[in-house]
Amino acid sequence: MTTARIFGIGRHRLTVDGEGVTTLVTFNGCPLRCKYCLNKTSWDMDKGRDYTPESLFEEVKIDQLYFLATHGGVTFGGGEPLLQKEFIKEFRALCGPQWQIVVETSLNVPFEIVEEMNAVVDGYIVDIKDMNPEIYLTYTGKENTLVMKNLEWILQHGDAKHIKVRVPHIPEYNTDEDVAKNVEILKGMGVVDIDEFNYVIR
């Protein structure tokens, strides 16, 4: 039986995490250690509770009418949702193609996971952090080689309209010039939906 630790389920999110009305499901577990992480709960596997795909489906299907009427569905975040690929695949089999399934991801996962999941999900929200390898490493504690490889691949094998890339201004880590360069590179790669924003430091 597939299980995953989930620390949050947020209902009735309108156009924040994808099209229409969505429910945001946040998994524990993340390969990054971002300095300004907003979901540090995801680092602690003792927080939250365990779900099976079936128990999660039973909990969130209360909003099915909203999902169908607005072309919404479930967005999986975290933490890093792509680390829970079997869970998401089984959940997709339960909800069927009518619900939109989106992953909010760093893409800092093995390429094989992205390749396998591309046919399962309907869209991506990619938190790119910064495309400069040195800035990325300093801010997250990890290299961004996998991120770049995976982003290039999903742009080649998916629908760019369903790939949103979030580009943050990160205080003390990148500059406005860095962000402008990130946006320029992303446009050159074929990204059409770019969300530039300021990190809020808690």
Where are these regions (language model features)?
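Conserved H-D interstitial segment of serine endopeptidase catalytic domains
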Residues: G48
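Conserved AdoMet/S-adenosylmethionine-binding subsite of the radical SAM
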Residues: K61-L65, T70-G73, G77-G78, L82-R202
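N-terminal [4Fe-4S]-dependent radical SAM core
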Residues: M1-M45, I62-T70
